[in-house]
Design a protein with these regions (language model features):
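N-terminal-proximal low-complexity accessory segments that begin disordered
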Residues: 8-44
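Conserved small/polar residues in nucleotide/adenosyl-binding loops
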Residues: 22, 39, 255-262
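Duplex nucleic acid-engaging cores and interfaces of nucleic-acid transaction enzymes
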Residues: 94-101, 105, 112-115, 119-257
Length: 262
């Protein structure tokens, strides 16, 4: 590394340091609780934007024919992405701890978000009825296999992902969009005022109802963050397998050579 390179901090890593300061405010007990919740939200919004714009560009540079080197620190795009992911992993662990602290401080004020396994049997039955009447009718479960095209997954949207086994033993993947303007994300427990459950957790718990002909092997919630420089939605054709479209898009990116970032 050149002597001049030691005088600079990589811009992307410096930005993460800034966002950590935002996160620190969310964990600062001297800051009012409502403001701390706002800081936690700002941290996540900032991180989404960072991955959509900054990391997205670095990923494109990694696929370029010519290696792109950041001219202040001499780091390649690949080195920057590696450092970014390692740092974000640390920040996300810190965020999880702060989130638990915030939830703990909200509880004495009469606001709680709980998991399904903490409900009584009667409460579970009430929420099952709520799911059947107010959520399930508005869900669009999909099954993806070798013969079905992979669907477009929208940016910053939640999806329930399940690994399925058919009655004939064939393995498939199920995808259920969880973001919907028809039902609320926060569902209040009828027997506990101020106590809420996230709609995606309710969907995941009862997801077997959406796939009655399959055995659920594994299930989880995922969220997609897309590169803001690529408008993949405009390129997508409903009759086209999204995997094929992405392959074509990557092949196109291989012929691009973005200039180094300042």
């Amino acid at each position: 590394m050149k002597k001049t390179e030691k005088c600079y901090t990589n811009r992307e890593l410096s930005w993460l340091q800034f966002n950590e300061r935002v996160l620190n405010e969310a964990g600062n007990p001297r800051v009012p609780l409502a403001e701390r919740m706002t800081f936690a939200s700002i941290y996540q919004t900032n991180l989404d934007e960072f991955f959509m714009v900054r990391v997205g560009t670095l990923m494109m540079q990694m696929n370029a024919k010519e290696k792109v080197i950041e001219n202040k620190t001499g780091m390649t795009s690949e080195e920057q992405v590696k450092e970014i992911l390692a740092r974000v992993c640390q920040l996300e662990k810190k965020k999880a701890k702060i989130y638990e602290q915030l939830m703990g401080e909200l509880e004495p004020k009469g606001i709680r978000i709980i998991n399904f396994n903490r409900l009584s049997n009667e409460e579970g039955r009430l929420l099952e009825q709520y799911f059947d009447a107010h959520i399930a009718p508005f869900l669009s479960p999909m099954v993806i296999g070798k013969q079905q095209p992979f669907p477009f997954l929208a940016n910053k949207q939640l999806y329930a992902i399940v690994l399925l086994t058919s009655q004939k033993g064939k393995k498939k993947t199920g995808i259920v969009p969880c973001s919907n303007s028809v039902f609320k994300r926060l569902i209040e427990i009828p027997t506990r005022p101020g106590c809420f459950m996230l709609s995606e957790e309710l969907i995941l718990h009862f997801i077997s109802k959406l796939y009655p002909k399959y055995t659920i092997r594994e299930k989880s919630i995922m969220r997609v963050t897309r590169n803001a420089d690529i408008d993949a939605h405009d390129l997508y054709d409903e009759d086209m397998d999204y995997r094929d479209m992405m392959e074509q898009l990557i092949n196109c990116l291989l012929y691009t050579s973005p200039s180094p970032r300042d």
